[in-house]
Amino acid sequence: MGKLTILVLVAVALLSTQVMVQGDGDQPADRDAVPRDDNPGGMSEKFLNALQRRGCPWQPYCG
């Protein structure tokens, strides 16, 4: 039982070290490289934004 505990602790230590080392290489080169959410209001706002860009046929609903 003691050997199994040591084995598990060593495995956890190795995996956490690997994750920390690999995580450092993922940084984007620029803050603008991160994709931004154009429609934070969800699907309904996305639909209304698409209608406004094309010329909305339902004027009262298109703000």
Swiss-Prot record:
It holds the Pfam family Conotoxin. The keyword Secreted applies. GO terms for cellular component: extracellular region. Keywords: Amidation, Cleavage on pair of basic residues, D-amino acid, Hydroxylation, Ion channel impairing toxin, Neurotoxin, Secreted, Signal, Toxin. One of its GO terms (molecular function) is ion channel inhibitor activity. Residues 1-23 form the signal peptide. The modification Cysteine amide is found at residue 62. Expressed by the venom duct. It is found in: Secreted. The modification D-tryptophan is found at residue 58. The modification 4-hydroxyproline is found at residue 57. InterPro entries: Conotoxin, Contryphan_CS. Its target is unknown, but this toxin may modulate voltage-activated calcium channels (Cav) or calcium-dependent potassium channels (KCa). The cysteine framework is C-C. This is Contryphan-Tx. It comes from Conus textile (Cloth-of-gold cone).
